[in-house]
Amino acid sequence: MKTFLILVLLAIVATTATTAVRFPVPQLQPQNPSQQQPQEQVPLVQQQQFLGQQQPFPPQQPYPQPQPFPSQLPYLQLQPFPQPQLPYSQPQPFRPQQPYPQPQPQYSQPQQPISQQQQQQQQQQQQQQQQQQILQQILQQQLIPCMDVVLQQHNIAHGRSQVLQQSTYQLLQELCCQHLWQIPEQSQCQAIHNVVHAIILHQQQKQQQQPSSQVSFQQPLQQYPLGQGSFRPSQQNPQAQGSVQPQQLPQFEEIRNLALQTLPAMCNVYIPPYCTIAPFGIFGTN
């Protein structure tokens, strides 16, 4: 290749030399012909020198280095493009239609709170029953002073002599108010009804023991020592003795009105209006 390039360059220089010799000839025609010949030979020698100097052009050999253009082969590495086609087949798991039956148990889940509500209602009912039982126990033991206070007022209203001394009566008032304050407000009306109910049943028991005698409210439910404030709660449950008979309803209304006038004012307790008109037995006293 080098020799071929050298030969080509020599041929090119030869042709250029001949052409260079030809062109200056017509320019030198007006001059003497003897002077033209040496001028023609001088450039030939110089041109040969130029040829020797121009021979270094072969350093153009590094140009074949661009042959690495076959580096286009890496483009063949782009063949992985068909690989992404595989994920397109993967979306076939769109069968998640199966989870749609799963939400069905969710519809059954809201039904569970319904059972919880029922349990809460049952618990509330049990709590209410327990409160009623506790209230009844309190009434049996703690509200006896209130019963005696109402009986004392009943005797005074009917012009009977006071059975209890003033000091004992004042102590009963204090005890009655203390126990009445411990009862929740929503149960105070029931407490007063139970007080009246206990008085009626107590008198009914006395009437059964003395059928020939009329019902009398002169004696208190408990006998208190004169001048002393100690008392013993009744061991018997007055509510278990029976229920108020229809003929005793007027007596119940009379005592209830008296109790509603005496106890709230004495203890500064608020009693709702419906307590004065509520029919007997609505609070489960019978």
Curated annotation (Swiss-Prot):
Keyword flag Transmembrane helix: no
Signal peptide span: 1-20
Keywords, in A-Z order: Allergen, Repeat, Seed storage protein, Signal, Storage protein
Keyword match Repeat: yes
Positions with biased composition (Pro residues): 56-71, 93-104
InterPro entries for the chain: Bifun_inhib/LTP/seed_sf (IPR036312), Bifunc_inhib/LTP/seed_store (IPR016140), Glia_glutenin (IPR001954)
Biased composition (Low complexity): 72-92, 105-120
Molecular-function GO term, any one: nutrient reservoir activity
PTMs per UniProt: Substrate of transglutaminase.
Region (Disordered): 51-120
Domain of life: Eukaryota
Family label: Belongs to the gliadin/glutenin family.
Note: The alpha/beta-gliadins can be divided into 5 homology classes. Sequence divergence between the classes is due to single base substitutions and to duplications or deletions within or near direct repeats. There are more than a 100 copies of the gene for alpha/beta-gliadin per haploid genome.
Task performed by this protein: Gliadin is the major seed storage protein in wheat.
Name of the protein in its database record: Alpha/beta-gliadin
Protein source organism: Triticum aestivum (Wheat)
